[in-house]
């Protein structure tokens, strides 16, 4: 008889066509397509040299550069003119203030002093003249009286001498002359000493001619001292104003945008090369892993087919095969299912028939295809997501590297720093030249004011001395002049501390605007790869979702299987109840056996069919009185049965068929 089935070698010759290998090959194709697509997307020029040929931006940057320098020069000139005006105003106001205060109060003091001294001098002269007239007249009268008294006394003395001579009889003219000289009374020099000398009146006349020349000279000297430092600063500022462009700005050059653009192009192209290498390396390793998995799947398929052939052979040679179709199909199901065979036959695990049915339902050929599609789809999606992940990491690394060492950003930042340094240096130089002498000026003005106050005190003291009006004059001078001068001194100090030119630095907005220029920031260009990767990632997510749906459909078979079991159990229960009511148990038993395959109602209307022939079991041979010591299959000719003649195939024993 010609064999029309495939034996084991013929089956193994098609093992490479198993569904797992085919699906894995599709995964390889999918990865190759993804690799080529990523390389094509990465290789596209997101920037090229043509972008750097646009000179418009260079002209704009040059214009901004020149505008900044010109504005600095204009600001310097304006600042100098403004400061000169301020200094001239302060100088004139200070001179005017000093002249106003000091000149006014010199005039007032002169009037007060002159009026007071004139009154005092006139009174003194009148008193002196009156004293001289009165004292001299009195002295003359006293002199006349003394002379008369002296004559009287002398006459009296002469009489006394005559009487004494009369009585004594002796006469001496010398004694009479002696007494006359002693009794001669007169004011003599005392009369001249009583009158006030005429030199006093001469001194009074000279004192009338005093003046306030000291205060007037002090006013003029103070104005000259105060004006001198202001004049010095103003002259220096005028000289600087004429040389406003003498600061060296040759080291400041505008950003060369073309060079920066070419650097960006080269940097982006280098990053693209790195990303392409990452895609190639990752895909290469994934393809190697898939090749190993495919080889393993071939080995697994080879092993599965080999085991399946052996299981079928064991099933054919199985002696204890049930004598019913249900039992036969049950045994065939166990041998045909690798999982059930391993659990029951190899490990001897006792499994309920319903559990066996559920496992068979979920591991059927149709369900297995769905399961295989789901698993292989998940593997494919995971590999693609891993490839996209590695590319994403490479892009992030490149962007991070560019952020850490961005030459164009450093170029822009360096330009801004250089410009700000130039502005600060220029500002410092201008302030030193403009206001460097302001401190000296304020110091000189303060010293001048202090010297002026000292000289004023000396002048007032020299004029009024310890007179009764000296204290009042000092108080008036301090309240009217001294306090004002203290305010001037405080104003000079404030001027030295606060007057300066502030040149504004280049605003940070310009640096941010430079950062926003795309071809100056390669990391911004690299950000364009992220939307592409997101697009691929979304498509792979869709594939993963479809694969999960396949697995969900396969898992749904468990629910469907359990529902079928419950339906069969309900039908069996109703069929068993109907058969028992009819008075027989044979049908009920037949129904129980047959409900493992079909519905009872279908069995009643389905005609009986002759089953497939198979070898007799030991019980059947005993039933048919066959010797049980003979083998079931023996190709030798001496094992022929005496009951049945040999068939056309020599060496083959044909046993009765069990229908």
Swiss-Prot record:
Residues 43-95, 307-367, 565-659 are cytoplasmic. The chain crosses the membrane at residues 22-42, 96-116, 286-306, 368-388, 544-564. PANTHER family: PLASMA MEMBRANE FUSION PROTEIN PRM1 (PTHR31030:SF1). This is Plasma membrane fusion protein PRM1. It comes from Lodderomyces elongisporus (strain ATCC 11503 / CBS 2605 / JCM 1781 / NBRC 1676 / NRRL YB-4239) (Yeast). Belongs to the PRM1 family. Residues 1-21, 117-285, 389-543 are extracellular. It is found in: Cell membrane. One of its GO terms (biological process) is plasma membrane fusion involved in cytogamy. Involved in cell fusion during mating by stabilizing the plasma membrane fusion event. Keywords: Cell membrane, Conjugation, Glycoprotein, Membrane, Transmembrane, Transmembrane helix. It is a multi-pass membrane protein.
